[in-house]
Design a protein with these regions (language model features):
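Short amphipathic secondary-structure patches
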Residues: 49, 54-128
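Short, intrinsically disordered, low-complexity terminal/loop segments
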Residues: 1-2, 123, 160-162
Protein backbone atom coordinates (compact mmCIF):
# COMPACT_ATOMS: atom_id res chain seq x y z
CA UNK A 1 0.00 0.00 0.00
CA UNK A 2 2.86 2.31 0.77
CA UNK A 3 4.43 1.70 -2.61
CA UNK A 4 1.69 3.50 -4.61
CA UNK A 5 2.51 7.10 -3.47
CA UNK A 6 6.21 6.52 -4.11
CA UNK A 7 5.44 5.14 -7.55
CA UNK A 8 3.33 8.17 -8.44
CA UNK A 9 5.98 10.56 -7.13
CA UNK A 10 8.70 8.92 -9.18
CA UNK A 11 6.64 8.78 -12.38
CA UNK A 12 7.80 11.44 -14.90
CA UNK A 13 5.28 10.75 -17.65
CA UNK A 14 3.14 13.79 -18.55
CA UNK A 15 5.42 16.35 -16.87
CA UNK A 16 6.23 18.06 -20.16
CA UNK A 17 2.54 18.35 -20.99
CA UNK A 18 1.83 20.06 -17.67
CA UNK A 19 4.76 22.45 -18.19
CA UNK A 20 3.46 23.29 -21.65
CA UNK A 21 -0.02 23.92 -20.25
CA UNK A 22 1.47 26.37 -17.76
CA UNK A 23 3.61 28.18 -20.35
CA UNK A 24 1.15 28.21 -23.28
CA UNK A 25 -0.93 31.23 -22.11
CA UNK A 26 2.24 33.28 -21.74
CA UNK A 27 3.41 32.35 -25.23
CA UNK A 28 -0.04 33.05 -26.70
CA UNK A 29 -0.10 36.50 -25.10
CA UNK A 30 3.39 37.16 -26.45
CA UNK A 31 2.39 36.19 -30.00
CA UNK A 32 -0.83 38.25 -29.87
CA UNK A 33 1.17 41.25 -28.63
CA UNK A 34 3.68 40.90 -31.47
CA UNK A 35 0.87 40.62 -34.03
CA UNK A 36 -0.81 43.74 -32.60
CA UNK A 37 2.42 45.72 -32.68
CA UNK A 38 3.20 44.68 -36.24
CA UNK A 39 -0.32 45.56 -37.43
CA UNK A 40 -0.09 48.99 -35.77
CA UNK A 41 3.34 49.62 -37.29
CA UNK A 42 2.05 48.54 -40.69
CA UNK A 43 -0.80 51.03 -40.34
CA UNK A 44 1.66 53.79 -39.44
CA UNK A 45 3.77 53.02 -42.51
CA UNK A 46 0.74 53.06 -44.81
CA UNK A 47 -0.46 56.38 -43.37
CA UNK A 48 3.04 57.76 -43.85
CA UNK A 49 3.04 56.55 -47.45
CA UNK A 50 -0.29 58.33 -47.95
CA UNK A 51 1.26 61.56 -46.69
CA UNK A 52 4.28 61.00 -48.96
CA UNK A 53 1.95 60.50 -51.92
CA UNK A 54 0.33 63.87 -51.22
CA UNK A 55 3.75 65.54 -50.96
CA UNK A 56 4.69 64.00 -54.32
CA UNK A 57 1.75 65.90 -55.82
CA UNK A 58 3.19 69.14 -54.44
CA UNK A 59 6.63 68.33 -55.84
CA UNK A 60 5.17 67.45 -59.24
CA UNK A 61 3.31 70.74 -59.67
CA UNK A 62 5.07 72.97 -62.19
CA UNK A 63 3.79 76.20 -60.66
CA UNK A 64 3.91 77.56 -57.13
CA UNK A 65 0.43 76.82 -55.82
CA UNK A 66 -1.17 79.18 -53.35
CA UNK A 67 -3.87 76.78 -52.22
CA UNK A 68 -2.90 73.39 -50.79
CA UNK A 69 -6.34 71.97 -50.03
CA UNK A 70 -5.88 69.42 -52.81
CA UNK A 71 -2.96 67.97 -50.83
CA UNK A 72 -5.26 66.98 -47.96
CA UNK A 73 -7.73 65.45 -50.38
CA UNK A 74 -4.95 63.44 -52.03
CA UNK A 75 -3.70 62.21 -48.66
CA UNK A 76 -7.13 61.02 -47.48
CA UNK A 77 -7.77 59.39 -50.87
CA UNK A 78 -4.45 57.53 -50.65
CA UNK A 79 -5.19 56.42 -47.07
CA UNK A 80 -8.62 55.14 -48.11
CA UNK A 81 -7.03 53.26 -51.02
CA UNK A 82 -4.61 51.70 -48.50
CA UNK A 83 -7.61 50.38 -46.56
CA UNK A 84 -7.93 53.02 -43.85
CA UNK A 85 -11.19 54.85 -44.43
CA UNK A 86 -12.03 57.63 -42.02
CA UNK A 87 -8.51 59.04 -42.05
CA UNK A 88 -8.07 62.76 -41.59
CA UNK A 89 -5.37 64.86 -43.21
CA UNK A 90 -3.96 68.09 -41.83
CA UNK A 91 -2.01 70.31 -44.22
CA UNK A 92 0.32 72.97 -42.82
CA UNK A 93 1.98 75.67 -44.90
CA UNK A 94 4.44 78.05 -43.31
CA UNK A 95 7.19 80.58 -43.94
CA UNK A 96 10.57 80.55 -42.22
CA UNK A 97 12.84 83.58 -41.96
CA UNK A 98 16.45 82.65 -41.11
CA UNK A 99 15.26 79.23 -39.96
CA UNK A 100 12.59 80.61 -37.62
CA UNK A 101 8.95 79.77 -38.25
CA UNK A 102 7.16 83.10 -38.64
CA UNK A 103 3.65 82.36 -39.84
CA UNK A 104 1.45 79.37 -40.46
CA UNK A 105 -1.64 79.04 -42.57
CA UNK A 106 -3.74 76.41 -44.27
CA UNK A 107 -3.00 77.54 -47.79
CA UNK A 108 -2.86 81.33 -48.16
CA UNK A 109 0.28 82.58 -49.92
CA UNK A 110 3.03 83.75 -47.60
CA UNK A 111 5.05 86.63 -48.95
CA UNK A 112 8.79 86.83 -48.37
CA UNK A 113 8.13 90.48 -47.50
CA UNK A 114 7.18 89.12 -44.06
CA UNK A 115 10.93 88.61 -43.54
CA UNK A 116 13.32 91.46 -42.84
CA UNK A 117 15.77 92.60 -45.50
CA UNK A 118 18.70 90.23 -45.85
CA UNK A 119 16.98 87.31 -44.13
CA UNK A 120 16.89 83.96 -45.88
CA UNK A 121 13.33 82.78 -46.37
CA UNK A 122 11.82 79.40 -47.18
CA UNK A 123 8.29 78.05 -47.57
CA UNK A 124 7.31 74.57 -46.38
CA UNK A 125 4.32 72.26 -46.72
CA UNK A 126 3.66 69.33 -44.42
CA UNK A 127 0.92 66.71 -44.32
CA UNK A 128 -0.15 64.66 -41.32
CA UNK A 129 -2.55 61.76 -41.92
CA UNK A 130 -4.25 60.43 -38.78
CA UNK A 131 -6.46 57.46 -37.93
CA UNK A 132 -7.09 55.16 -34.98
CA UNK A 133 -5.90 51.58 -34.57
CA UNK A 134 -8.03 49.06 -32.72
CA UNK A 135 -5.93 46.27 -31.17
CA UNK A 136 -7.11 42.65 -31.12
CA UNK A 137 -7.87 43.09 -27.42
CA UNK A 138 -8.83 46.74 -27.07
CA UNK A 139 -8.11 48.16 -23.64
CA UNK A 140 -7.54 51.55 -22.07
CA UNK A 141 -4.44 50.03 -20.47
CA UNK A 142 -2.50 50.30 -23.75
CA UNK A 143 -0.17 53.32 -23.77
CA UNK A 144 -1.87 56.25 -25.50
CA UNK A 145 -5.22 54.47 -25.86
CA UNK A 146 -8.45 56.43 -25.69
CA UNK A 147 -11.60 55.47 -23.74
CA UNK A 148 -12.62 52.97 -26.46
CA UNK A 149 -9.24 51.25 -26.33
CA UNK A 150 -8.19 52.64 -29.72
CA UNK A 151 -4.70 54.00 -30.30
CA UNK A 152 -4.25 57.15 -32.43
CA UNK A 153 -1.69 56.68 -35.20
CA UNK A 154 -0.42 59.23 -37.70
CA UNK A 155 1.95 59.51 -40.63
CA UNK A 156 3.88 62.68 -41.47
CA UNK A 157 5.63 64.03 -44.55
CA UNK A 158 6.93 67.48 -45.42
CA UNK A 159 8.77 69.32 -48.17
CA UNK A 160 10.28 72.72 -48.85
CA UNK A 161 8.36 74.28 -51.74
CA UNK A 162 10.60 77.30 -52.29
Amino acid sequence: MMRLPFAIKADQRGAALIELALAAPFFAALVIGMVDMSRAYSMKLKLEQSAQRAIEKVQASATKPTDFTYVGTEATTAATAAGYSGSTATVDYWLECNGTKTAETTGAPLSPSNCSDGETYARYVSVTVSNTYTPLFASRAWPGANAQGQIPISGYAGVRVQ
